[in-house]
Curated annotation (Swiss-Prot):
Belongs to the TRAFAC class translation factor GTPase superfamily. Classic translation factor GTPase family. CysN/NodQ subfamily. One of its GO terms (molecular function) is GTP binding. The lineage of its organism: Bacteria, Pseudomonadati, Pseudomonadota, Gammaproteobacteria, Enterobacterales. Pathway: Sulfur metabolism; hydrogen sulfide biosynthesis; sulfite from sulfate: step 1/3. It comes from Cronobacter sakazakii (strain ATCC BAA-894). Residues 25-241 form the tr-type G domain. Its EC number is 2.7.7.4. It catalyses: sulfate + ATP + H(+) = adenosine 5'-phosphosulfate + diphosphate. Residues 206-208 are annotated as: G5. This is Sulfate adenylyltransferase subunit 1. Residues 168-171 are annotated as: G4. With CysD forms the ATP sulfurylase (ATPS) that catalyzes the adenylation of sulfate producing adenosine 5'-phosphosulfate (APS) and diphosphate, the first enzymatic step in sulfur assimilation pathway. APS synthesis involves the formation of a high-energy phosphoric-sulfuric acid anhydride bond driven by GTP hydrolysis by CysN coupled to ATP hydrolysis by CysD. Heterodimer composed of CysD, the smaller subunit, and CysN. The keyword Nuclease does not apply. InterPro entries: CysN_GTP-bd, CysN_II, CysN_NoDQ_III, G_TR_CS, GTP-eEF1A_C, P-loop_NTPase, Small_GTP-bd, SO4_adenylTrfase_lsu.
Length: 475
């Protein structure tokens, strides 16, 4: 057993008390990202090592692996704790998103170690989609690079508001305060182009030597701020969904017997309470919450992130993919939306194509009407393109086969985030973040002349690959 865990169990007074304390600690999900060889995996290995989260057999295995694959001479190569794939160890790079868990007395953490290479942008976007904070690692010798800008942009695009800029390898620049300040100013100048209200913090460190990671550095007396671990332990995460209106996407209708009908799902925003009047969308039918059921017993209320089963006072028609909101709130159904897309397939995204999409438990179909632009994620410029290639990020217009109740992604990632699914292979080919739900911009049929209506039907019959919309309101 890990000696630190054994000590904590003894301190808490037994296994049950320890597990109870662990369960009620706050959880922080964060990712590490940066350019190739900036030391992301080494930093995570250092965090695990210095917080004593490594078991004895892991430490023994690490000694052996360091001799075979290590890059640090006689020292332990802490990066090997995270780089688990054989290809990663042989190449000395991170390819897949590697997840690790550790905890301190103050908090629990889930780390996503994401790839630094541009060709693995989709992997990084996947890792960032569930995180609250991003650690942007920089090599003190190189400063702000294109990949640093790219990772900053992707992180903020996916809703991350807290950025910790970790200036690594300070030991290679003689722990120079001047170098650190120059990099700090360069990044703040660039960060002015990023969207939203960002919380940006800076920590100079050496992941290899352990300076300012979990222990205050004796080599940088000029830095009086917190260590990286202290930042992670004490930072207050602003979760927008806690302050948002109620959003409860129904994932499953639970009917084990004739006497029970519940709607299972995870609260995606706001708070639901017993007795609260709710409205089911898209039907608009109202009822009130009779019970909030969980495995551990009934609750009086449930907040964002809690998985519960709601029992309503009335038996109304609700199915998987429907959305429960507060009865006093309105959420308009829209047929189209402007969506930021991260494309993940070898086959590029082309206007006119249709895909299955999944959003908050609901599955439907969408057509790509237009690609406004692709973002050059190395310098944040926009360029007009005919298609969106693998790892491309751009703004597109989508038209849905049926009206959907959507939020902006920055307001609610669950009801504003979607995935694209290839209709033939059933493979996920892209991720989308709703920037702006759009009301139906099409004219009523009566606004078109008889000639326009006839021409529209002719085009749809003989040129279906053009993807022309039915002006009479069909699909």
């Amino acid at each position: 057993m890990n000696t630190t865990i054994a000590q904590q169990i003894a301190k808490e007074g037994g296994v049950e008390a320890y597990l109870h304390a662990q369960q009620h600690k706050s959880l922080l999900r964060f990712l590490t990202c940066g350019s190739v060889d900036d030391g992301k995996s080494t930093l995570i290995g250092r965090l695990l090592h210095d917080t004593r989260q490594i078991y004895e057999d892991q430490l023994s295995s690490l000694h052996n692996d360091s001799k075979r694959h290590g890059t640090q001479g006689e020292k332990l190569d802490l990066a090997l704790l995270v780089d688990g794939l054989q290809a990663e160890r042989e190449q000395g790079i991170t390819i897949d998103v590697a997840y690790r868990y550790f905890s301190t007395e103050k908090r629990k953490f889930i780390i996503a170690d994401t790839p630094g290479h541009e060709q693995y942008t989709r992997n990084m976007a996947t890792g960032a989609s569930t995180c609250d904070l991003a650690i942007l690692l920089m090599d003190a010798r190189k400063g702000v690079l294109d990949q640093t800008r790219r990772h900053s942009f992707i992180s903020t695009l996916l809703g991350i508001k807290h950025l910790v800029v970790a200036v690594n390898k300070m030991d290679l620049v003689d722990f120079s305060e001047e170098t650190f300040e120059r990099i700090r100013q360069d990044y703040l100048t660039f960060a002015g182009q990023l969207p939203g209200n960002l919380d940006i913090r800076f920590v100079p460190l050496s992941a290899l030597e352990g300076d300012n990671v979990a222990v205050q550095s004796q080599n940088m007396p000029w830095y009086t701020g917190p260590t990286l671990l202290e930042v992670l332990e004490n930072i207050e995460i602003q979760r927008v969904v806690d302050e948002q209106p109620l959003r409860f996407p129904v994932q499953y209708v639970n009917r084990p017997n004739l006497d029970f009908r519940g709607y299972a799902g995870t609260v995606a925003g706001g708070v639901v309470k017993v007795g609260q009047r709710v409205k089911a969308l898209p039907s608009g039918v109202e009822s009130s919450v009779a019970r909030i059921v969980t495995f551990d017993g009934d609750l009086e209320e449930a907040g964002a992130g809690e998985a519960v089963t709601l029992v309503l006072k009335d038996e109304i028609d609700i199915s998987r993919g429907d959305l429960l909101v507060d009865a006093s709130q309105t959420l308009a159904a829209v047929q189209s939306a402007a969506v930021d897309v991260v494309w993940m397939a070898e086959q590029p995204l082309v206007p006119g194509q249709s895909y299955d999409i999944k959003i908050a438990g609901k599955k439907t179909r969408a057509r790509v009407d237009n690609i406004h632009y692709q973002v050059d994620i190395n310098n944040l410029t926009q360029r007009v393109v005919e298609n969106l290639p693998l790892n491309g990020i751009g703004l597109v217009d989508l038209t849905f086969d049926e009206p959907l109740n959507l939020d902006k992604y920055q307001e609610n990632p669950v009801t504003g985030g979607l995935i694209f699914i290839d209709r033939l292979s059933n493979v996920t080919v892209g991720a989308g973040m709703v920037r702006e739900p759009q009301q139906n911009v099409y004219q009523e049929p009566s606004a078109f002349s008889a000639f326009e209506l006839e021409l529209n039907q002719l085009i749809r019959r003989h040129f279906p690959h053009w993807g022309a919309r039915d002006l009479l309101g069909g699909k």
